[in-house]
Amino acid sequence: MSEGVSFDDIVEDRHIVVCCGTGGVGKTTVAAVFAVEGARRGRNAVVVTIDPAKRLANTLGLDSLSNTAHEIDRSRWDPAGDAPSSGRLSALMLDTKSTFDDLVATYAEDDDQTQRILANRFYRNVSTALSGTQEYMAMEKLYELHENGGYDLVVVDTPPTRHALDFLDAPQRLTRLLDNRIFRMLMMPTRAYLRVASAAVQRFLRTVSRVVGTEVIDDVVAFFRAFEGMEEGFRDRAASVLALLAESSSSFVVVSSPRRDAVEEAAFFAERLAESDIPVEGLIVNRVHPSFGEEGVHGLRARAETLAAKKAEAARAAGDGAASADRLGGLYANLADFRQVAERERHHLAGVKARAGRAAVAYVPFLSRDVYDFDALAEVGRYLFATAPARVVPGG
């Protein structure tokens, strides 16, 4: 990453943008903002979301989203017609099982092998419920769109995992599974020249079946037998995905909120990425409370107390100033509360920019309305890109 990278550089020059962070910090919104801005600058952009809520679909002018990219009507995101004609915007919602099914079909030797795997009960469970499956399929969908979709900007909203690094670890976990001794043993019963090992496997399976039941074991064995011959394709694909994310054309943007836990998770993620030689290029802190001036909390509370005293004095004198003093005092008390929240957030954010290295940093304020349409997405974008007005900086 070059010195002084900006969010404009990311949206104009990168081919892949991965928005990551803990759940509930606005990743889906930020991903949509990047895709819309890319389209407005003439890029063929697609946003991949994992959020099953229909709010993003409604924002983009769609009734729903599916696992297939759907192009959004240009009049929705470019009503003035100012964007270059090359600009296009599409969106899809990741369907983990459908993506896994497609991957199986890609590496199966024939349709018969594909159908045997898809019909297997063990496969139907692991394709949706196995830990890390959603993260890996998000990576797979990203790779598929980049390689075969014709898009020059793919923006991914990563799954809301407790630890954001699960997204990066997913391909490696799959590789470790394929290289696992038990996995290889389960593949052996179909190979006649490994009868000794096969006998050992049978003893192992009989022991396990006493715990989980024979029917479950039969499904597992049938799955691994059907999977035979596909492991190398899956292993190569996982390596290709990791290589793609390590390229300079890929960018990681960490999204956080000012909450202490979210900030710490974001900083930790940035540091771990750096250890893997994958620098974070952007850090976006979402829903920041403005400071509302320079006066400190104590000064504001003192003003509120002074006005409260004036109210009491006016009430004793039966004067007319009691009501106005009461209202103004209440406003100062509210302002002090907001100022205290802003100071607490500033404390949480202290040093986060340094921990993010040379990443571009933006603070998006707590907006007065929810992000539910393209105008609201544009409002968020003003705090990221060159057309932005003066930006809200914590403590300023």
Question: How should each PLM-predicted stretch be described?
Answer:
Residues 24, 129-132, 256-259, 263:
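Short, charged/polar micro-motifs that form catalytic or ligand-binding hotspots
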Residues 2-18, 25, 30-235, 239:
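Nucleotide-state-sensitive switch-loop elements of NTP-binding domains
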Residues 1-11, 202, 209-225, 235-396:
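C-terminal lobe/tail of nucleotide-utilizing enzymes
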